[in-house]
Amino acid sequence: STRVRSSAASDVYKRQIHPRVRKDFTVWVERQEKCEIVGMESAILYEAGFQDTVDAVIMVYAPVELRIQRAMYRDGASEEQVRARIAAQMDDEEKRRRADFTVVNDGVQLLIPQLNRIVEQLKTEKFIL
């Protein structure tokens, strides 16, 4: 079936691509000598096993309908395509439980004050090596 082929292709993709992404990220981080903080953006951080590559995880949360609208606008994707991508990802509540910090990006709460608090906490709690 198409689903089985898709799953098999996905497994091959994960085995080949994720190690390369991890290696490229590690090399990139090593080149950022003058940066106090560096970040990795990944919608599938936990699914790809990248949580062990970072010192702290900041989950950016937005209501699902807002995420769908933003992704449709940004990517030119259909609602069905975006919903399928979201369905393939870990549940938001599970991500929130696992994350060290959460930023709410709902268009109402201000982002910069949230990020400033997190950066200060990272410095204070010695997440930064």
Predicted segment positions?
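Single conserved hydrophobic/aromatic residue that forms the stacking wall/gate
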Residues: 1-9
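Short, well-ordered alpha-helix to beta-strand connector turns
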Residues: 9, 35, 54, 99-100
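Active-site loops and adjacent core secondary-structure elements that bind or stabilize anionic groups
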Residues: 12
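Hydrophobic/aromatic residues within well-ordered alpha-helical segments
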Residues: 17-21, 118
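ATP-dependent NMP and nucleoside kinases share a basic, alpha-helical "lid"
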Residues: 23-74
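Small-molecule kinase domains that catalyze NTP-dependent phosphoryl transfer to phosphate-bearing small molecules
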Residues: 25, 52-53, 73, 77-123
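A short, charged, Gly/Pro-tolerant segment at domain boundaries
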Residues: 124-129
